[in-house]
Amino acid sequence: MSSVNVDFEQAGELKIGQVGIANLRIRTLDVPRLVREMQDRVTRAPKLFGRAAVILDFGGLAQAPDLATAKALLDGLRSAGVLPVALAYGTSEIDLLSQQLGIPLLAKFRAQYETAAVRPPQPPPPPHARAEPAAPVARPAPVRMQRNTVRSGQQLYAENCDLTVLSTVGAGAEVIADGSIHIYGTLRGRALAGAQGNPDARIFCRDFHAELVAIAGHYKVLDDVPMDLRGKAVQVWLEQDQIKIAALD
């Protein structure tokens, strides 16, 4: 079984979301390096990243950038071909920075920075007559089934379940699942498994020509896949935050 795992440290980690917005988690305030990395991404996958909406996440830094650095980063990313549209919610400093930059905070990222409130202890319920527990009923895992071809420009989302596609996913099409994805035809478009952050989700495909595959936001584009895996039956999984692809034959 052959596999590929490209492992190198990046100045910014880009994750693909299920709503067409990418989250750029900033690891360093080296603006020229961040801009070069984004230019490289856009060059290698222009249909995916060209004019893509991007959320900037400064949560990985010891402190928020100053206004001049943040403005330079936004201008550089725009020149690289993407569109910074918001900041990920973080601290009061990030809140102030978003106001100074004139761009919003994205509320959906709030949960990444706040711990859940502790529920106060509840009084014990009154005693009831003991009843025999019902025998557990085995429930099959939910699966969404797609029998027809997913054509260019279409997006198919399997919420809270796996997705099985019996036909082809065409170039420019996108299939997304909160669970795993099984494709029994050709995958030429994009497949995003574990869309709500499940790192154990996998992608299985009989004929692999994907523009992009992603699991829990971590992604790999076709240009990063060795030629000997293209056109093969493969599985895709996530290991130590790195996408791995291996032939099934």
UniProtKB/Swiss-Prot annotation:
It comes from the Bacteria. Signal peptide: none annotated. It holds the Pfam family MinC_N. Residues 117-138 are annotated as: Disordered. GO terms for biological process: cell morphogenesis; division septum assembly; regulation of cell division; regulation of cell septum assembly. InterPro entries: CAP/MinC_C (IPR016098), MinC (IPR013033), MinC_C_sf (IPR036145), MinC_N (IPR007874), Septum_form_inhib_MinC_C (IPR005526). Keywords: Cell cycle, Cell division, Septation. PANTHER family: SEPTUM SITE-DETERMINING PROTEIN MINC. Belongs to the MinC family. Cell division inhibitor that blocks the formation of polar Z ring septums. Rapidly oscillates between the poles of the cell to destabilize FtsZ filaments that have formed before they mature into polar Z rings. Prevents FtsZ polymerization. Interacts with MinD and FtsZ. NCBIfam families: minC. This is Probable septum site-determining protein MinC. The gene is minC.
